[in-house]
Amino acid sequence: MPLRWQIDHAARFVHIVGEGPVTIEQLEEHFDAIAVANAMGYAKLFDASLVQPRYTDDDVMRMGARLSAYTANLPSGPLAVVGQSEEVLITFRRFVNISPSDRPARIFRTEAEARAWLKSQSGHL
């Protein structure tokens, strides 16, 4: 599975790991699962170090509409993404730019940096 996630309700934390090609449909599935679990407001760590994004500009716009629907009714917790490839950096910027949420979001080179920042943002981890 290209995307897998674990939700820790006690810690109010979602850990997402991606590997290989990831499509917009797989991202939608992950967002839906997190929303259904009432975890949208939790701190999120997305390790995209091994992700190969596979979506078009139209896909990104479609995801923007979906994120608008989520954030209209659900809180958004801080997001830390781990990744170093140019592809992941570009994709992160595109999603942050289209997201209607004003949540804090940053990209990091290491998981340790991401976790430290999330802890400073949410007090959890």
Report each predicted region and the residues it spans.
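Amphipathic, Lys/Arg-enriched alpha-helical "gate/interface" segment within cytosolic domains
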Residues: 1-125
